[in-house]
């Protein structure tokens, strides 16, 4: 789950860092976009995320964790392919605008599913550590993904290779979804946890 989370949070980081730079530079046939136009597109993707977060999150919550994580990755793949394709068309802004929908949908489906998977996949005594590691995925992605994106954009002059690479990476981590085994049944019944009476308190143990 951590590996999948790093890829997904990397995609989120690239939407906020590499995408505006790609828009300003332009593509192979797509003209460059002004800073105002780039800002408007970023505002559009944030607005879409706000609108989709609750209904999509509620929808995937009624299904398995694999479904939620897989839906998020599929949304990222479709969005990346649309972003890469936009560079070959003079009216590529249409494809970029369309790409905002699956990207926002994927983020809305992935984030709650990933957080839930981190909790359910981890033994009770290690859940605090797992959530700390999950939060570090954002830090790792925010540091590494923009650095890789900047290097590719400087070398290529456009974002085709970057977005195709991200689509391939998202597809490559999908087999890891088979390892996700939630601790909750389909009937939302939790696996019984340890009773407090079964775990001796240090104070009680000392009295004994």
PLM-predicted stretches and their roles:
Residues 109-122:
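Intracellular juxtamembrane helix-capping segments at the cytosolic ends
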Residues 115, 165-198, 205-207:
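Multi-pass alpha-helical transporter architecture, strongest
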Residues 35, 122-134:
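Loop-to-transmembrane helix entry/capping segments in MFS-fold secondary transporters
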Residues 51-65, 153-154:
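Helix-to-loop junctions at the C-terminal end of transmembrane segments
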Residues 151-170:
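A membrane-interface helix-boundary motif in multi-pass transporters
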Residues 6, 93-109:
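Hydrophobic core of transmembrane alpha-helices in multi-pass small-molecule transporters
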Residues 17-37:
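Short amphipathic helix-loop junctions that connect adjacent transmembrane helices
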Residues 74-90:
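C-terminal ends and interior cores of transmembrane alpha-helices
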């Amino acid at each position: 789950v951590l590996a999948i989370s790093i890829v997904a949070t990397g995609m989120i980081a690239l939407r906020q860092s590499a995408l505006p730079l790609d828009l300003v530079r332009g593509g192979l046939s797509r003209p460059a976009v002004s800073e105002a136009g780039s800002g408007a597109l970023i505002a559009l993707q944030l607005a879409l995320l706000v609108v989709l977060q609750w209904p999509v999150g509620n929808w995937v919550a009624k299904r398995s964790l694999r479904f939620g994580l897989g839906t998020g990755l599929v949304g990222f793949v479709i969005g990346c392919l649309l972003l890469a394709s936009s560079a070959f068309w003079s009216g590529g802004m249409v494809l970029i605008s369309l790409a905002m929908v699956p990207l926002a949908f994927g983020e809305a489906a992935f984030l709650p599913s990933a957080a839930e998977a981190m909790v359910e996949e981890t033994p009770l005594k290690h859940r605090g550590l797992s959530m700390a590691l999950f939060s570090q995925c954002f830090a790792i992605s925010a540091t590494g993904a923009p650095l890789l994106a900047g290097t590719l954009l400087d070398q290529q002059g456009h974002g085709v290779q970057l977005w195709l690479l991200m689509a391939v990476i998202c597809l490559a981590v999908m087999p890891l979804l088979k390892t996700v085994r939630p601790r909750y049944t389909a009937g939302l019944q939790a696996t019984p946890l340890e009773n407090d009476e079964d775990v001796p308190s240090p104070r009680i143990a000392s009295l004994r």
